[in-house]
């Protein structure tokens, strides 16, 4: 928690020489105590938007917090242009988003998942970090689209508690949970819809996808990580709420990602990707190229911190 006592206790225990905060982390008491003790602090992979409190007439306290950073490293020129007028002595530089390097590392060290090969023949559609609104739409489309009869669905819900898995399962006919299937796979029919009821598999599952769908686009907070799928050269689909995510907008503009608005547009998009192999490959290739083009943020970030610490 961000409190004077918590900050003091943490400083005494860790005794940091430098502190790096990530993206949206603004911990006032930690920043203040670091400034008093002349400990360099950096905000990395930061993103700023006009609707944030820093740019409101009542955001003076939050604007003053920005002055406590030794340096702020932003993802893009839009963030830099927004924040530059608010800074005095704080160093400011565009370094990009370190998540691009992270997903490239995941792809380079990918691990095989044995049970995927046991699925029925056909293309696999992986849906990652999905919510109830996603399940309603995906469930409707999977039951209607003729082209999807030859596909396997791997559904990876954002929440894997019993109630959430039960709710997810209710949207799909004859869906099977992974834990259930693995214990009875010798006697149970191979699933068309497999619901992953455990954590830690999603980033590795995308390598097996013909198409990836990213959840969260129908929630207030927006979509989850599109880069984990894009790095494997997969066409990536998501819902309408992506305006807070520069990487998603960039992926769309690079023709590696497709935004859908409802069940009808998802149906049409899936049919196009499944029927038109040239289009599907071009979309996947564009997704990978987009990720590769944005590599290097980690090195830039480390160099900036080293030079300004």
What is the predicted role of each segment?
Residues 1-107, 126, 130-132, 143-145, ...:
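Active-site and donor-binding regions of nucleotide-sugar-utilizing enzymes
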Residues 8-13, 184-191, 200-210, 231:
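Short acidic alpha-helix that forms the nucleotide-activated donor recognition element
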Residues 10-12, 65, 118, 205, ...:
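Structural alpha-helical scaffold elements that stabilize or flank donor/cofactor-binding regions
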Residues 41-45, 90-96, 150-155, 175-178, ...:
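Short hydrophobic/aromatic-enriched beta-strand-loop microsegments
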Residues 69, 202, 207-289, 304:
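Catalytic binding pocket for nucleotide-activated donors in carbohydrate/polymer assembly enzymes
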Residues 96, 177-180, 188-198:
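Active-site donor-binding acidic/aromatic loop of nucleotide-activated sugar
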Residues 104, 108-182:
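Conserved catalytic-core segment of nucleotide-activated headgroup transferases in glycan assembly
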Residues 294-309:
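C-terminal alpha-helical cap of glycosyltransferases
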């Amino acid at each position: 928690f961000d409190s004077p006592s918590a900050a003091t206790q943490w400083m005494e225990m860790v005794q940091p020489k430098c502190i790096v905060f990530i993206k949206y982390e603004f911990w006032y008491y930690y920043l203040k105590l670091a400034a008093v003790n002349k400990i360099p602090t950096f905000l990395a992979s930061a993103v700023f938007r006009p609707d944030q409190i820093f740019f409101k007439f009542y955001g003076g306290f939050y604007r003053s917090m920005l002055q406590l950073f030794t340096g702020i490293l932003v993802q893009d020129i839009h963030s830099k242009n927004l924040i530059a007028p608010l800074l005095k002595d704080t160093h400011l530089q565009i370094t990009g988003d370190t998540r691009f390097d992270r997903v490239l590392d995941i792809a380079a060290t990918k691990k095989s998942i044995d049970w995927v090969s046991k699925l029925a023949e056909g293309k696999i559609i992986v849906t990652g970090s999905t919510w109830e609104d996603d399940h309603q739409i995906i469930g409707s489309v999977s039951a209607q689209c003729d082209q999807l009869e030859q596909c396997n669905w791997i559904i990876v819900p954002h929440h894997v508690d019993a109630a959430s898995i039960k709710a997810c399962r209710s949207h799909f006919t004859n869906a099977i949970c992974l834990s259930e299937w693995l214990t009875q796979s010798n006697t149970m029919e191979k699933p068309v819809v497999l619901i992953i009821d455990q954590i830690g598999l999603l980033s590795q599952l995308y390598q097996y996808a013909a198409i990836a769908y990213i959840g969260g686009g129908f929630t207030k907070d927006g979509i989850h990580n599109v880069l984990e799928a894009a790095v494997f050269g997969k066409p990536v689909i998501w819902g309408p709420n992506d305006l807070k995510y520069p990487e998603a907008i960039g992926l769309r503009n690079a023709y590696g990602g497709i935004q859908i608005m409802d069940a009808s547009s998802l149906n049409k998009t899936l049919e196009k990707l499944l029927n038109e192999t040239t289009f599907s490959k071009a979309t996947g290739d564009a997704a990978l190229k987009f990720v590769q083009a944005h590599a290097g943020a980690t090195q830039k970030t480390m160099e900036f911190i080293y030079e300004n610490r």
